[in-house]
Design a protein with these regions (language model features):
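Flexible loop/turn segments at secondary-structure boundaries
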Residues: 3-4, 36-41, 51-54, 63-66, ...
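Acidic active-site catalytic centers that drive phospho-/nucleotidyl reactions
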Residues: 33, 87, 167
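A short catalytic or substrate-binding loop motif that flags glycine-/basic-rich loops and adjacent residues
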Residues: 21-25, 34-40, 165
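Structural beta-strand/beta-sheet cores of well-ordered domains, especially the beta-sheet scaffolds
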Residues: 27-30, 39-41, 82, 170-172
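ATPase catalytic-site recognition across NTP-hydrolyzing enzymes
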Residues: 1-32
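C-terminal nuclease/phosphodiesterase catalytic domains that cleave nucleic-acid phosphodiester bonds
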Residues: 44, 94-100, 107-193
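Nucleic-acid-processing active sites and adjacent nucleic-acid-binding tracks
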Residues: 13-19, 37-90
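Hydrophobic/aromatic beta-strand patches that form the interior of the parallel beta-sheet core
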Residues: 30, 85, 108-110
Length: 193
């Protein structure tokens, strides 16, 4: 039996009570992961005020219900978040196209490369082990973090999350990647010269 990458004990060590979570954050990013078979989609939020990043999972459901609610949710928040990082072979392209059609700002929607997806997985694993993230109780995210195993990506030794329920923790890693690497500042106004 393959061991989980994060595991229940390590993940439980990053748990905080909901009342201790700030009501607002200086920087916010979203991560969206479609499951490999395209049957489910997960949306995670990563936010920080300069310290540890806080992770939540507001959306995780079958794609059979469609993605209209997810697209709307992401579009109305585009003016407050630095980015949304969208990954997955099934559904990701259509989601990105719909967001662009709704006129979200340039640079808001990001599609990660294989190397960036690898970085996202290692980033969330490392952050869980070093106290770099917090989260509130969320059964879908907690189960994913406790059970997701290692999946090889490419031939260069890269890895990501695998297993039956990896989409929530992968979405969290993508959100954390966006939070730490995006240069987009939604509060900055463009200057016309």
């Amino acid at each position: 039996v393959e061991q989980p990458l994060i595991g229940e004990e390590l993940w439980r060590g990053t748990l905080v009570d909901a009342p201790s979570v700030p009501r607002s954050f200086e920087r916010v990013a979203y991560g969206v992961k479609f499951s490999p078979d395209g049957s489910a989609v997960a949306l995670a939020v990563a936010a920080t005020n300069g310290g540890a990043a806080h992770i939540e999972l507001p959306f995780c459901e079958p794609t059979a219900r469609g993605t209209r609610r997810l697209v709307s949710w992401l579009a109305v928040r585009a003016s407050r978040a630095c980015c949304v990082v969208v990954d997955g072979r099934s559904g990701a392209g259509a989601l990105c196209d719909r967001l662009q059609e709704l006129g979200v700002p340039r640079g808001y929607v990001l599609r990660p490369t294989a190397d960036q997806a690898i970085t996202a997985a290692s980033l969330i694993c490392e952050s869980a082990g070093t106290g770099g993230i917090t989260h509130i109780e969320c059964p879908a995210l907690d189960l994913s973090a406790a059970t997701a195993t290692r999946r090889e990506i490419g031939r260069g030794g890269g890895w990501g999350f695998g297993g039956e329920n990896s989409a929530p923790i992968e979405a969290a890693g993508l959100a954390l990647l966006g939070l730490t690497t995006s240069k987009r500042n939604p509060k900055r106004k463009a200057k016309v010269t």
